[in-house]
């Protein structure tokens, strides 16, 4: 090699080597790789070259450099010479115009390519090839290793490094802003104009809820991009994820909405993509990493050569694989042509009619109101039924004037958008919305089981497993919402609804905020603090006990406020009361921001993992709070160690609501005493104050469109689906048809509930077609027209009876009576052994799981008058908590095998007909399988078999001549039982014997009202009201599925399945009359000295004589009855029956008084004082309840009563957790008048916790939403004030010994 070549080579080595420590960066003249004139612009800045490491590999990149020197930019000085142009490179950044292809992708824009010679010699090419490809270091002329640290490009693209450092992002943005200042300023200016023009508050809201939510997200993405650009945090990876989010939102808009407003969303997405397109391309070029590219290129080359056998034209193949050979116009033209010029597909008249009807906006006339579910500050929630599909919904009516005067129109649109967009099994779904003259209405799915607040009110603290399940399902709902940027802001037990299967659904998004959806590129340093202060409000919003400290301080808040509320909710689940309370908002907020949490001790102490979870959720600082970093922090807590998060819906819940009928709303508290909203639309309204946004509120979600169109389609299609028609429809239409015409005249204007028939097995499941069911569910829906009375025959039951036909038998009118088999009426002394042992035997059902239908008894002469007026007695008739043939609108809604026990056996010759009750009522359209069950273990109606014609007994005024007795019927092998009544004896020659009453028969109806499951006093009350004529329906025990088993060894563990005693009112009845009825019935207390010409002597118990007792009044209770399973009580306890109303003043319901909810502004209420009289207030035009924060504090709060803990008897429980989970029913039956002997000594701390749990009055709702009304709860000392006897009611034939009634766990059982 000649001397000149050697000198040139050494000089090249010097130029390529990096400076040593302490030496400044050398920057020479930059020469262009593009042939052309010198550029007058600034030279491109170089990479920061800091912290050189001796002996490093040439393949290393300066990734891990010091943070202190991160911003030291050794820019090249301005110098003469040529520059290479970025515009000459493809967007991938690997193409150059150098003569040597070996250098084409070796260096990126970050390399010192300006120091390379323009025309290298072969020796130089050999050296450069070795230099860039070899892993060996090259000795420079000074003996050092060269290079020590190669100035590679720092790529921020995914997959290159394990993490991305903020200083790298900031450094890259400095380079980007320095090099392309106009691109950055142009993007930020356009983003600001975009936000100004398209923000939700700057234009009318979209009419479609899904599109409204997507609009919110697009605007939030643009706002986040503008903020990150100002903070120098944008990267090519961020733009890539932003593009993916926009495409995902656009896909949701096309799939989930049929509105014409989709074009607006498409236009919005295109504008935003155009705004960010140029910065995204520039950053992609700047962040190009040749090392990563070479690895990918080698892998692709090996795959191409080995796998596909490509030998020639490899560069062209790579270009094709990278998509660089495609013409973008070829893909854009067909799309535009498809959108603009594609002719509409031909449609048939039927399809056009379906589309027109499905797209028709819903209105109030499409629904018929069944009853009130609950009241709130802004409006009320009603149970309604769609007139065409016959499906049940819950409709939320919000007063428009309240919203306008409070300037919260935008907030109700946010609630509508969230409910419409959300698709999660743990979030309530909305189907449509519309406006009336006075209200904004949102139609949502009906969740039957009430809310967790009512459950806590009736049950007290929940068992740990039950609380864990509820909490975990709420965590999944919260995870879904937070991923879409939704902050609920009002999490509390009141907003956690319980489905018929015992699972949780989150509802009430009236205070929610929509923020930015989760993005992976937001995981940078400082993002947690920014997200924790995403929103700032000028006033405190939420429910006081659940408001986080940062909201109280008005420091800004975000998703961590929901985790604070979750900690309060879990504490309330396990302890029974909230951890913070006070008489005034100031006192309450003072405890929230300063007080420590008080924990129960002793037997009631919480598990260590649960206490740790609550403590970490209730951290004062939102940055330290569990869940702030993501939902995975909560899900990985040891409290959920053994929990299967993926199978929560398959988990069997401990509490499964027992519904009596499809319109049963007894699990909800109507709160009629606190709020009153007029349901009429005829009241005067101020139309001048109407908002221009309100007409946009009417919308129809894709769920409702699919259901409506499917009902229209299935109504005209022949289908073998087994269906029946509701009695309310019969009552409305009022037409008559013959049996022949009824099977032929099937028209599309009749929409019926769906059934799936397989022999006599009737199953149904979730009616949402887009959600996949579990293996045990049938995802079918049919709304075809079928006869009004349909029952399945017995072909798989356990009980006796001939096997019926496999096809359903439709019975219209009164069929022939069953074959006469007149039994011999035994004398009282000659009862069978089985009947005589009923009081001490355990009766159980072994037919759990069989699917049978419930007959509805028809009176004689009503056979063909299907649509005529109904009798008063069946109007009040109800199905029992364990089943039975119910009147009214049908039998009870079935429960799982663990809850319901008795199976109804319908023989082929049964002479009565009735509607079938489906496990999934198609009138209750659920968005997912968690709302209703369709497992084969669901019993449609579990009591008796064939019912005889009613036995009418006429008395001469002396007596009826028979006695009855209450028996326990246990449900399967469980400890849950229901009370049934049998005819114990019939006197010879008495009116009862002459009418055909037989001893040993099971009484199912008295005067047309079902008595299955009623306590004994209720049955006695029905008899005493009958006068000289009584109508009984009975059935033989051998015709039922009740089996006689061995006597129970421990009757104290029995749990009675209660049912509320209430009568049904007509839909057109004025609700105001119920109050006067209730007062009139309370004054007519039954007297113990009169027999009402029945000869049945009756002793009243304390709870029956109380005016507030539900056993006294037949009117429905305004509050939710206690429906939870009863706890364990001693066997020798003589007690009055528990009150079915938690708000009753009966001392038999300590849970009602003890486990009360915190009141709105007064944390502790007086327990013994009378309720405060409500002062009259002038009716305002807007009917707006005042904000609790605006109310002045009470000068003299009511005194706190001593702890009622000594009043609780020592009840044996299997564990401390179960002891806390005792319900009001069992606590009532276990109450003693001499409860002083059963007191337990406790420390002052434990008594304080118990006092806080037992003395909190009814809970409050949101500060903005609800007014403060104090409600007084009652305590045990009233028991002594009543002065009423607590003896067990007895019924006996005149002149004979009274027979004790099995009302509870007594010694006679």
Curated annotation (Swiss-Prot):
Enzyme Commission designation: 2.7.11.1
Binding site for ATP: 373-381, 396
Keywords for this protein: ATP-binding, Cytoplasm, Disease variant, Epilepsy, Intellectual disability, Kinase, Magnesium, Nucleotide-binding, Phosphoprotein, Serine/threonine-protein kinase, Transferase
Stretches assigned to the Protein kinase domain: 367-640
Active site residues of this protein: 490
CC per GO annotation: cytoplasm
Positions where Phosphoserine occurs in the chain: 66, 85, 146, 680, 710, 728, 754, 774, 782, 792-793, 1223, 1273
Family from the record: Belongs to the protein kinase superfamily. AGC Ser/Thr protein kinase family.
Subunit details: Interacts with PTEN.
Name of the protein this chain belongs to: Microtubule-associated serine/threonine-protein kinase 3
Species in which this protein is naturally found: Homo sapiens (Human)
Gene symbol of the encoding locus: MAST3
